[in-house]
Amino acid sequence: MADEAYQCTIVGISGASASGKSLIANTLYRELRAQVGDHNIGIIPEDCYYKDQSDLSMEERYKTNYDHPSSMDHNLLFSHLQALKMGESIELPQYDYVAHTRKPEAIHFAPKRVIILEGILLLTDKRLRQEMDFSIFVDTPLDICLMRRIKRDVHERGRSLDSVIEQYHKTVRPMFLQFIEPSKQYADIIVPRGGKNRVAIDILKAKIGQFCE
């Protein structure tokens, strides 16, 4: 049953692919969770809301532009944020990076005092921006993002080097310039130098921690 008096603060963290936004989000979540407990803070990656492609062949899935807003089920994410703000639990989708589709099983996710939402396309959607109490854009040079993406996708996601570079030039960089970089204007806070900017992390931790009290 929804709790109309429930207070849930949504913090959005966006930026280019491999900009360090996930590192910042996970660092904030891990350190704040140690202070306030699991029941007060949670984290939701936008990647969980890539559209289900189980009806497509693997060849068709490879052709999907995963850096375009149309690849995301923002309708579902929006409805989930509304539910969480009402004190309702959700079933959080899980995405399989190897199969390029949504996993059959979801994870039960209970409402929290603070939810950190992180992803590349969050600030491109006006509805999502309106659900956020404040937002952050991680501003990292694209050449650094590319090197990080190669390391991540080859070693952690089983991709070939050629496929990562081809995707970068074909969709990642063009979509960043068309959608993600322009969305920086909507951020309340700009963080340079990615996830290793400890000063920024400490400032954000103090700010977000206020909402957990």
From Swiss-Prot:
Keywords: ATP-binding, Cytoplasm, Kinase, Nucleotide-binding, Transferase
HAMAP family from the UniProt entry: Uridine_kinase (MF_00551)
Location (main, coarse): cytoplasm
EC number: 2.7.1.48
GO cellular component: cytoplasm
Family matches, as SUPFAM superfamilies: P-loop containing nucleoside triphosphate hydrolases
Gene name, Swiss-Prot/TrEMBL: udk
Protein name from the UniProt record: Uridine kinase
Organism: Photorhabdus laumondii subsp. laumondii (strain DSM 15139 / CIP 105565 / TT01)
Residues reported to bind ATP: G15, A16, S17, A18, S19, G20, K21, S22
Any GO MF annotation of the entry: uridine kinase activity
